[in-house]
Each structure stands twice: as structure tokens, then as C-alpha cells.
């Protein structure tokens, strides 16, 4: 049996009180905390300055809203754009609205939108 398996078996045999003591001892020994990280709430006033740079969006998401009548052509274009397999591309098209590509430049987003619309899809850029 490996060391890891031996440790797991030993931990299985401990009571809740002993497990609590073990956690405290590990925290002290290694200088870590077993507590879950707490998300910091941002004050509404602090968020206001961050809104000004947000107007100059540099990354865009291309969302497939609807495949339209030429679904096969849309699947082909989705495969070309994303390098997904046939099954994955078909699932993405079937589950529309879904993002096709995320965090791309404006030029790339416009190019993808044009290709998808040419294939018969309805597309949105966010």
C-alpha cells in the first residue's frame, strides 16, 4: 500500500474531533488556512471609476442566436471558426443562442459574424 493510501485509511479512522485537531495542526505546521476564501464586496462608489474605461471595449463575444434554414452550412462554418468536431459543432448550433467565440478582437468578431450570416445564421456581437 502506498503512503497516500495509508494516510487516507488513517484519516478514515479518525473521529470528527480528531479530524478538527488534524486540520488545525496542518494549518499551524504549513502556515496555511483551510477556510474558504471570502469574496470581497465592492462598494458602489468604488465601481464608478471603472465604468469609464469599459466604454472602450477591446474584447468581444460572438453569439450564435439562431441557425436559420441552412443549418448544415452554419455547422460547417462553426467547425471552420472553432476547430470543433462535427458532433460538438452540431451541438453548439442546436443549443443556440450560444457563444461561438469569446474574447476576440473587433475585427475578428466582425469577420466571424459575416461568415456565419453568409451561411444563414443570425449572429450578435457583445
Curated annotation (Swiss-Prot):
Quote the cellular component terms of the Gene Ontology held in the record: cytosolic large ribosomal subunit
Q: Where are the transmembrane segments?
A: none
Q: Which residues form the signal peptide?
A: none
User: Is Ribonucleoprotein found in the keyword set?
Assistant: yes
GO terms (BP aspect) = translation
Alphabetically sorted, this entry's keywords are: Ribonucleoprotein, Ribosomal protein
- Please list the GO terms describing molecular function: mRNA binding; structural constituent of ribosome
Q: What does this protein do?
A: Forms part of the ribosomal stalk which helps the ribosome interact with GTP-bound translation factors. Is thus essential for accurate translation.
PANTHER family with a match to the protein in the record: 39S RIBOSOMAL PROTEIN L12, LARGE RIBOSOMAL SUBUNIT PROTEIN BL12M
Q: Which family is it part of?
A: Belongs to the bacterial ribosomal protein bL12 family.
Subunit details = Homodimer. Part of the ribosomal stalk of the 50S ribosomal subunit. Forms a multimeric L10(L12)X complex, where L10 forms an elongated spine to which 2 to 4 L12 dimers bind in a sequential fashion. Binds GTP-bound translation factors.
Protein name according to UniProt: Large ribosomal subunit protein bL12
